Amino acid sequence: MSESYQKLRKDFKELDFTDRLTFLAESLLLTGQSAIVGGLEVAGRVVETVTGTVGSLIDASGITNILGGSGGVVGETIDRVAITVKDVSRSAGELYNDAVRNVENATSNAAKAVGDVGVSASEAVKNIAGSFQKTTGNK
């Protein structure tokens, strides 16, 4: 095992019980966040790649210029498809960015809450231990 891991392990063992629980809870939240964000990144890339590829094919093929210039029903339909594909690509990117921001904000808030609870629990345990020592010391 590496030195940094050994040091982390030693430091963890020296923590109070409540601090250990808080550390583990925060670690779980951050691991969960990483998994969710990673999944969103993959999904966002797939949607953007597919819609971007379709949009690029429509633009590169010149179908809109050839058939769209006719002004007929086919031309209008192809124009609508091209616009829809570009809108979907833009929307997918925006939705992905919003989703990542929401996950990061929720995880950050949850981690802060866990940290606050851990601090409160740690203080409560220390206060109880201090009170116990005071009462036994007075006898």
UniProtKB/Swiss-Prot annotation:
Cellular component aspect of the GO annotation: chlorosome
InterPro entries the UniProt entry points to: Chlorosome_envelope_CsmC (IPR020995)
Entry GO MF terms: bacteriochlorophyll binding
Keyword Transferase: no
Annotated localization: Chlorosome
Keywords of the record: Bacteriochlorophyll, Chlorophyll, Chlorosome, Chromophore, Photosynthesis
Superkingdom classification of source: Bacteria
Pfam family, one: Chlorosome_CsmC
Residue ranges crossing the lipid bilayer per the database entry: none
Protein's UniProt keywords contain Transmembrane helix: no
GO biological process, one term: photosynthesis
Signal peptide: none
Protein name: Chlorosome protein C
Organism for this UniProt entry: Chlorobaculum tepidum (strain ATCC 49652 / DSM 12025 / NBRC 103806 / TLS)
